[in-house]
Amino acid sequence: MEFNKLELLIIRALKLNTNSNKKNSFYNKFLNLRNKVLNIQKNSLDQPSDAPSNNKKRNLDQPDNPNQKEPGKARKIIWSFIIIILVLGVLALIILSGFSFSATSLNAASFTENGTSSFKITTNTNQTRTIGGAPSTIYQRDSTLYVIYIENSFSGYYYSAIITDISVSNNTASVGNGSNTTGGSTSNLQKGLQIANLLVDGSGNVYKNKDNNGSTTSGTTTFSLNSNLTSAMKLQGWSSNQSMSLPTSYSFYTAASLVLSILPFILLIGIIYYSMRKMGQAGGGQDNVFSIGKSQAKLAKSTVLFSDVAGIEEEKEELIEIVDYLKRPDRYAAMGARVPKGVILYGPPGTGKTLLAKAVAGEAKVPFFQVSGSAFEDMLVGVGAKRVRDLFNKAVKSAPAIIFIDEIDSVGSKRGKFETTAGSLADQTLNQLLAEMDGFNTKTGVIVMAATNRLDVLDDALLRPGRFDRHIQVNLPDIKERVAILKIHSRNKNISETVDLEDIARRTPGFSGAQLENVLNEATLLAVRRNKKSIYTEELDEAIDRVIAGPAKKTRVISLEEKRQIAFHEAGHAIVGMYTKGSEVVEKITIIPRGQAAGYTLSVPEIQELSIQKKSDLLGMVAGLLGGRASEEINFGKEFISTGAANDLYKATNIVRAMVTQFGMSPNVGLAQYYPSEGTVNPYQSKNFSESTSQLIDKEIERIFKERYEYAYKIIKEHNKEVELIVESLLLLETIVKPQIDFIHKYKQLPKEALEKKKELEEKKKAEDLIRKAKKESEASSKEEKEMDVEKKVQKPSASSTEPTSKPKKAPSKESSSDKKK
């Protein structure tokens, strides 16, 4: 049992401060308490990622990071503040709207005294507005009274006027609806004879100081406003001859109206900003103008565990070790071990590279940032490098953490291949990635995982130790691994007990894990379509064919002659394969059209998943591919060969060219390799060998093709009887499988199913012939009866004579009379 320093200090204190009788009891209690704490820690580590109890608690074995902040906290605070401002703005709009009114809203208002230098206007809504400033002046033109006043506002004074018709009687100015009460069109007001100055003496009396004659008259003058009167208008200015322009309406400007004039712009800006943020979130942050330079990585939340991954046990163990290091780093630090800074997964598509990354995300109790390699680059220069920095900064704040870059070949390909501007810009992103992984500013506590299908195109600096220390190749599964994958994906499917998953795995060589999952899914859909409660071998066979060549096109109209030629073509593949050593075993032949293929032959290796292939195996594959064309030539002639061998010739050409230029299997060309690797192909670069060598390669390819075709032609010529039996079986059954093919090969006769189908068709043909014959006989008899009826009608009728009616016919009149007597 190992103790840390703190536990050793506690034990030492117990030994010093307790007597010998109590030492053991205290020590036992301490051990019990320590074991409980360790059990709690272990349970929290073993708890799955989707458990609801401790999802939000940090792992006890993980070191706390003081720099780590709750993600999105500042953003939530900012958005809360913006929402509060918007709500308060709307409330202010509602409240302040009650304090804004225009002159046209005045109803039965009156002037009352308010101090010595201001007037108060009271409206029908019991709202009061104070008009302050210099003493107002009354002008009169014709019979119109103009009350001019100055209003104090935020930025100075507004010149305002009240227009009303007036008739003076007993020092009282009565206001009525005159011709100018609505203002009419804009007119110039000349400064006319001054009638009176309105002064307030503080006692509530309004005096009329001067009249038309210049004399002063005392007494109170009252001004009442009519309810239908346009009562206030703003003067736009004074001219040099003291004239002024009066608009047709006027509104009072208050503090509320100023706020209301600005508030719509604030609301509009807030709505636009909010909409742009929502658009950025809806698009995953890709097209948001506010996050051009930010990383597009997301925190992955996966429910996939290592127990859900089958068929790649060695690769899984490599990643389990990394997850264990993240959970228990002290165990490795005690031994002086350094965790790999980077792990790259490479292999063919569909083999489970991304699935392994999901399992790491589900098992690890650390933040897992997932991003695609193409998400770094954008239309702006320098965005890629900026996003790389932002990604690693996020990961460091959450350390220990894992970064997973899917399809890293889009950002980490070899530098300087084409020496173009676009290439140099892409190199900036790669250089920043190299610096972040292992540069002067190396970030600790961050592990980088990546996946690619093309390891050969990646830059060497990216693959060196210190960046991607561990390279894990994920290959296609062998037969045992395919069985394990099928069992994993069949856990939630109702598969019949009669189905042999090992047989399905044997018939699917070269299938990836994704293809095997697709086979089971297609079989499930077919079972549902056929109203079956379980999945049987028939559905799985059809699903394999659908994955290989697509769905069957049974409604396609194909003539009998085309079917015969397709059958001879496929039979040629099968016969050459059966008589060629090292060739693949024929599992199935069909002439049902699927996809672009009019028919196909399914072959599997005799020995599953060979690590290497011999020259004889490759030559046997080429001969089998050429068997279809040879069979057509033998049975139809050179002038009647078809285009059905196009795909066969394409595959055979690739095999032969690889034998000559890559594998060194040609004695004339030699061992030199003239086949460039995939990552170094440059469309602007010429061939790296001479023209004479190129001609030699072409001649050698042509020689191998000629030899293999003659070999296939010879086999089909010798065993053409078997070819014809296979063709007849295909025309009867459309699809034959391995037991039926082996029966034909062994006994040189039709299999049982073909004979039964042939007998059924013969009986059907006999029945159709009988029906056709009976129909003809019935038609003939009916024709004879009609002729006899015609003859009877033509015969001479005679009551006394019993002789045959060979006499000439009577006159029509006599016949008609005798008929009448009858």
Curated annotation (Swiss-Prot):
It comes from the Bacteria. It is a multi-pass membrane protein. ATP binds at G347, P348, P349, G350, T351, G352, K353, T354. The active site is at E570. Binds 1 zinc ion per subunit. Pfam families: AAA (PF00004), AAA_lid_3 (PF17862), Peptidase_M41 (PF01434). One of its GO terms (cellular component) is plasma membrane. SUPFAM superfamilies: FtsH protease domain-like, P-loop containing nucleoside triphosphate hydrolases. Homohexamer. This is ATP-dependent zinc metalloprotease FtsH. It comes from Malacoplasma penetrans (strain HF-2).
